[in-house]
Structure formats: C-alpha cells, structure tokens
Curated annotation (Swiss-Prot):
Protein name per the record: Uncharacterized protein aq_532
Keyword Signal annotated: yes
Top-rank taxon: Bacteria
Source species of the chain: Aquifex aeolicus (strain VF5)
Keywords, sorted A to Z: Signal
Signal peptide (UniProt feature, chain positions): 1-18
C-alpha cells in the first residue's frame, strides 16, 4: 500500500485527493488487523480488500467519483467486519448488478419477404468486453452455494471487484481501460473461489455439507 503511494509521488502526479483516500484506506486495514478480521471475518475482509484493489485501479485514472463510491462501500464493510469479529456474526453484504435496458432491432429479408427481431442490450459493447453476464452467473452461484464459507476470502474479494465492474457499467460512459483492468483482476480470484467451492462440494466438506446449520465452520485448505 505504501509502495503504491510512493509510486504516485515519484511520477510527479498531483494526487492529493487520491493520496488522502488511500491513506484513509490504510487506516481501515489497521482496524481490521486490530480486530483480527482476516481470521474472524474472512469474507468481509476479502470484500474490503477487493474494494481497495479497485480503488487503486481508479487512482491511476484519477476518477474521484468512483473512488468515493468504492471507499464508502469499503468503510461499511470494514465496520461490519470489525463488529462481526467480536459478535461472531458475518452477514452477506451488497451484491451490485447492472440491469441493462433491452431493445429489439428489426431485420427484413427482401428476397424472402420475411422479417425478424434481434435482441440487444444497452452498452452491449461494454457488456461483451468483460463477458458480464457470465461473471454475474458465476458470482451468484458462489453466493447461493456457500462460497462465503468454503472460499470466504476469495469470494469476498471477487464479489467486491464484480460490484466495481457493475458500477462502472452503470456510468453514462463506461471506461474500457478500467473495465478490462477490473476483469483481469477479478478473473483469477473468481477461479480460485470456484475451485475451492467445487472441491468442497465434491468432498462434501462441512463448509458445504452443513450449509443449513447456523454454526458452519470456515474451510481452510
């Protein structure tokens, strides 16, 4: 984290706003460390980490509004992680999804005298750029099949990065460069969470087998 701030200074970029938010983010990690949240509430700890990784990507592009939004989410999850570490409760938190407007275009064949309609989505170019609907299905599968218990840190981090992708798609003019960077950051973490969950399902580990219980232990490979 400190190395990232030093890089900003070395390149001579005027990032007083960004630097301030990054420093404030570091203080959040101090709170998490004091509460031992990495061990006690790994899902929420991963979610905070995911938002921080997204903030660093936006810091390079100097997008203040995005940084503010993600920092707010980061702060909320930090509070829940710290509280959960002491109360032994760790709830699922926000899953942000982009619901694009659907429209249909008519195409007619002059020779056959037939017409048909083709389905399209708003911002289709950006949706396809990150394969958004596939990401959404994968994250929702983890969320609905105890990814929180079988791959808590990876799932939390993946969910936060997915939320950042969704928020970017909601912008009037999504940033292609940022979307690609977020997707590249998200994909390996999402794969890791999926592999851990599949292993738990195959081996019927307690984190998955006892998923209806109120007291489910986290799985640590």
């Amino acid at each position: 984290m400190k190395r990232f701030l030093l890089l900003i200074i070395l390149f001579g970029i005027s990032f007083s706003f960004v630097s301030d938010y990054l420093l404030r983010a570091e203080s959040l990690f101090s709170q998490l460390k004091d509460a031992n949240a990495k061990e006690e509430t790994p899902y929420l700890y991963g979610k905070v980490k995911g938002y921080y990784e997204a903030i660093k990507l936006y810091a390079v592009e100097y997008k203040e509004d995005r940084i503010k939004t993600l920092f707010t989410l980061m702060s909320k999850n930090t509070k829940k992680a710290v509280r959960g570490a002491y109360t032994e409760r760790e709830p699922l938190t926000e899953l942000i999804t982009f619901e694009p407007r659907v429209y249909f275009e008519e195409y007619c064949d002059g020779i056959m005298d037939e017409c048909f309609y083709e389905k399209h989505y708003e911002k289709e170019k950006f949706i396809e750029l990150v394969d958004y609907f596939s990401l959404k299905r994968r994250v929702e599968f983890l969320r609905n099949h105890e990814g929180k218990y079988c791959a808590p840190f990876d799932f939390g981090m993946a969910e936060a990065l997915f939320n950042a992708v969704s928020l970017e798609l909601m912008q009037e003019k999504p940033d292609e460069k940022v979307l690609i960077a977020l997707r590249e950051k998200l994909e390996p973490i999402l794969v890791m969470a999926e592999e851990k969950l599949r292993y738990a399902m195959k081996k019927e580990l307690p984190c998955y087998r006892n998923r209806l219980s109120e007291h489910i232990g986290y799985w640590k490979p």
